[in-house]
Amino acid sequence: MIKIFRILFFINISLCCGEFYAQNESFKVMAWNILHGGNDIENGQQNVVKIIKEIDPDIILMVETYGSGPYIANELGYNFHLVASDGTSVDNKSVNLSVFSKFPFGDRIDTDHPFFLGGSEIIIHGIKMRFLSNWFHYLPWNNEPEKMGKTAEELLEWEKTEHRYSMIQKVLPYFEKYASQSDLIPVIVGGDMNSPSHLDWSKKTKKIHNNLVVPWYATKIFEDIGFLDSFREKNPNPLKKPGITWDNKMRNDSHR
């Protein structure tokens, strides 16, 4: 369901922008689902390394790591944190989420649902920040929900079927907790929401979505608890800069 080489140059949802300024310094965060550890194509891991090197992020919030983390980190010189129970082998091929950083790690951020959410503190220019990598289930999914013959209200009800909505309920308390503490410890979240963005389904864009305005729950819930979408903060016009991803430089995935 998830396209190969999904990439966001700045993290998707955060309490601060993709680039953070403190003491005249900045850092760049990248959120990326590399699809099955990058192993679905020939030389996939090497291509992952090449793309990361081109973008040169300071921090990477990775999804679908699946054992490729140590190779990527060693090739590029990043510190590496696997979102899994303490003591899990870093090359475990069943572990989804991970964090890479040029800066030193602080304390682990563990949850009861490490396949969906977890991360680490990172110390940046003397400032402690929290970084969370997350993954929401891809079901229910439709490539063109505007063509399903449903109203906005019916689409929101449809969104609650299958797995994604129930998964969000399990990890929502963690997001609420860290958002409430963000005045003391800033928090950045990046990953794979497996959902259209409500900011791309507004009144400004309804003409390309069958006149539908849909406040998609999987992204709207972050706004409701105080997070900002850093991509949309930096690129406020969703028609000129749609929040899409790509699996190669010739083909866009029009929603995710």
Feature names for model-found ranges:
Residues 35, 66, 135-137, 193-196, ...:
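Catalytic metal-binding/acid-base residues of hydrolase active sites
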Residues 26-36, 128-158:
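Active-site-proximal beta-strand elements of phosphoester/diester hydrolases
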Residues 81-99, 178, 182-183, 197-256:
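Active site of divalent-metal-dependent phosphoester/diester hydrolases
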